[in-house]
Curated annotation (Swiss-Prot):
PROSITE patterns: PHOSPHORYLASE. Gene3D superfamilies: Glycogen Phosphorylase B. This is Glycogen phosphorylase. It comes from Aquifex aeolicus (strain VF5). Its cofactor is pyridoxal 5'-phosphate. The gene is glgP. PANTHER family: GLYCOGEN PHOSPHORYLASE.
């Protein structure tokens, strides 16, 4: 094969995120320049731009052979046909304010984004016609820096598009495709970027274009801005911009699925489109409702987006002149009938304009149905549920894949949502599964120490910071992981309720424990920042003996290391505020045991043999103390003894039995394949039938 064709093929692979969940492709890029691969944090685009070793590799027969193998896998995947493509001729358009696809594409903040990313990946794997739309955030989300006093500083993270897997969408003249929407009476332009997620397309809107005024260029600048006016403009551009973009691209949407209320104005944009065609207001709403799905993630009414009525009125004054509709009709869509004073509520608008609504776990359905019941007094509450799932090929460790290929069969990835497949996990020898797990723990600790070393070299950081960030971690020690957004209701510091008792647990000379924390607080979340500071200062405290670590700037790369490398995944939000949670699913699929309060998905996932649970009790008085006490008791009486109980080979046989049960029970039930099939069967098939 000609060298230029190999280069073209490598660039094609680098610009399609298919490589991120296919280990042979990862290994292909790593083999080009292993040191640079590590330095670039596994970014193939940056690797190909910077490496000086590629020319030699192109003369290496083994490398060329490896490339041909990977490229053939890729082409076979991209060209395969699915039953869904035959059944559904129009796509579902999926809108989300964030997407967690890979750490080289920093347009995510947390779990909501990774759920969206996993839906795109799974739609590609299943061959289901789905298109994603979101924002290209030039500044992404905050970069976290922890000061010596433990306080989180929020640094701007400038996205370097030339190093990201994004390309400009071009118009018929070969120029960057730009569209515009009206925000109030002003044109706001946006350029369009494209991301290839396997066979699925993701389009990203970017208002940072020269046609815009400085204040309008800021609309898509970063995720989750606190300023209400800017946030509303984001919502308007995402909703109305999506409809305009689809028209420009000639895409006839079969239906719309919004991930939280942020993109809710897409429903209104569709209504206006039908008004132009001559439909009445009520008939337009009726037609849009038929093809609309709203997924709610919020278990608290105070956490939804609300705006003063005058802001909405200013945006939609034109409806009187253009459509003969009183602007009050628009305002009524988002008005709480029990408390109009709260302003325009975009979640309420979403609930009114979507025929199909789902919560993200069975427990969350119960909470949401009760929370919004006042909207459905005269009719049946429409809130169904689809419990979240995670993309198995993305989150599973490559070592574990090799074990599965040997003992479950080469096509285990295609069959991973089949429960019967996982009965075969009993055939994996305990010592082999344990060897895999220990390797991953060693890699996690090495990665954490590399991050600390990098900060030492680049910043000459205070040694106490490096100690707190994990320099003393030990792969022989029982390791607990806690990694997620740092905010009050998730109670990250709950385990420090009884500091002296925790010191005894972690410093036990024969059976020590270490705890690794990671996660960012929202820039405006002062309580979350105080929690981080508290944990970080405990990590610096010599009395904890280096057994507590807080790793700064949690990202998707660190998440991969953590959900594979710790022994226990701790989860202790204040119930019922965990809508679902997904990090514990990722951990369980990798044989990491889940220790969690009974909330969110764990109510459905826990079977008494695949982890530990607490919180199924009524508490009078201090809930935090009761839950902390439960965690200490489980650690002291169950987790620690089980982990350190070894046979003559040094293998914790009973622990591994629980690992196998976790993998067997969680993988088929909480994978994104099961989730997407649920969406198809419950909602998408009905929406596309309505449209058809």
């Amino acid at each position: 094969m000609e060298e230029e064709k190999v280069k073209e093929g490598l660039w094609e692979l680098a610009y399609n995120l298919w490589w991120t969940w296919n280990p042979p492709a990862k290994e292909l890029f790593r083999s080009i320049d292993p040191l640079l691969w590590k330095e670039t944090k596994e970014n193939p685009i940056e690797l190909l731009r910077k490496t000086k070793l590629l020319e030699n590799k192109l003369k290496d027969e083994d490398f060329i052979s490896h490339f041909k193998y990977v490229y053939s896998l890729y082409k076979t995947y991209m060209n395969r046909h699915s039953k869904y493509e035959d059944t559904y001729k129009k796509p579902i358009v999926f809108l989300s304010p964030e997407y967690g696809l890979h750490h080289t594409l920093l347009i995510y903040a947390g779990g909501l984004g990774f759920l969206a990313g996993d839906i795109l990946k799974e739609s590609s794997d299943l061959g289901f016609p789905l298109i994603g739309v979101g924002f290209m955030y030039p500044q992404g989300y905050v970069k976290q820096r922890i000061r010596v006093d433990g306080w989180q500083e929020d640094l701007d993270a400038q996205n370097q598009k030339e190093l990201m897997p994004v390309k400009k969408v071009l118009d018929k003249e070969g120029k960057w495709l730009k569209c515009y929407v009206y925000v109030r009476d002003e044109k706001v332009y946006f350029g369009v970027w494209e991301v290839n997620v396997g066979k699925t397309k993701l389009y990203l809107l970017d208002t940072n274009v020269e046609e815009n005024t400085p204040w309008n260029r800021e609309i898509s600048s970063r995720l989750y801005v606190p300023d209400k006016d800017l946030r509303l403009r984001q919502q308007i551009v995402l909703g109305f911009g999506t409809v305009i973009l689809l028209e420009k691209l000639g895409i006839d949407a079969g239906g719309f699925h919004i991930n939280e209320d942020y993109p809710s104005f897409v429903f209104l944009a569709e209504i206006f489109k039908l008004l132009k065609k001559g439909l009445t207001w009520d008939k337009a709403i009726e037609e849009v409702r038929k093809i609309s799905l709203f997924t709610t993630h919020t278990p608290l009414r105070v956490a939804v987006n609300t705006y003063p009525f005058h802001m909405i009125e200013e945006q939609f004054l034109f409806v009187k002149d253009v459509y003969g509709i009183d602007v009050k009709k628009v305002l009524e869509l988002g008005t709480n009938p029990e408390d109009p004073s709260e302003g325009f509520n975009s979640t309420i608008m979403s609930l009114r304009l979507a025929k199909y609504v789902n919560a993200v776990s069975k427990r969350h359905q119960e909470v949401s149905s009760k929370m919004w019941s006042f909207l459905f007094k005269e009719k049946e509450n429409p809130i169904d549920y689809v419990t979240n799932g995670v993309h198995f090929p993305t989150w599973i460790c490559s070592d574990l894949r090799r074990l599965y290929e040997e003992y479950l069969g080469e096509n285990f990835v295609e069959l991973h949502d089949h429960k019967s497949l996982w009965e075969l996990i009993r055939d994996i020898p305990d010592e082999e599964l344990w060897e895999y797990h220990i390797r991953n723990k060693e890699r996690l600790i090495e990665h954490i120490k590399d991050r600390a070393r990098e900060r030492w070299v680049k910043e000459k950081a205070d040694p106490s910071i490096l100690m707190a960030e994990g320099l003393f971690l030990d792969s022989d020690v029982l390791t607990v992981g806690f990694a997620r957004r740092m905010t009050g209701y998730k109670r990250p510091d709950l385990i420090f309720t009884d500091v002296e008792r925790l010191k005894k647990i972690v410093n036990d000379s024969e059976r020590p424990v270490q705890i690794i924390f990671a996660g960012k607080a929202h820039p405006a979340d002062i309580e979350g920042k105080k929690i981080i500071q508290r944990i970080f200062n405990f990590a610096k405290d010599p009395e904890f003996g280096g057994r507590i670590a807080f790793v700064e700037d949690y990202d998707e790369l660190l998440a991969h290391y953590m959900v594979r490398g710790v022994d226990v995944w701790l989860n202790n939000p204040l119930p019922p505020l965990e809508a679902c949670g997904t990090s514990g699913m990722k951990a369980s699929m990798n044989g990491v045991l889940h220790l969690s309060i009974l909330d969110g998905w764990w109510i459905e996932g826990y079977n008494g043999k695949n982890g530990w649970a607490f919180g199924d009790y009524e508490v009078e008085g201090d809930r935090n103390r009761a839950d902390a006490e439960a965690i200490y008791n489980i650690l002291e009486n169950e987790v620690i003894p089980l982990y350190y109980e070894r046979d003559e080979r040094g293998v914790p046989v009973k622990w591994i039995s629980m690992m196998k049960e976790a993998i067997k029970s969680i993988t088929p039930n909480f994978c994104s394949r099961r989730m997407l099939k649920d969406y198809i069967n419950k909602f998408y098939s009905k929406i596309l039938k309505e449209e058809g």
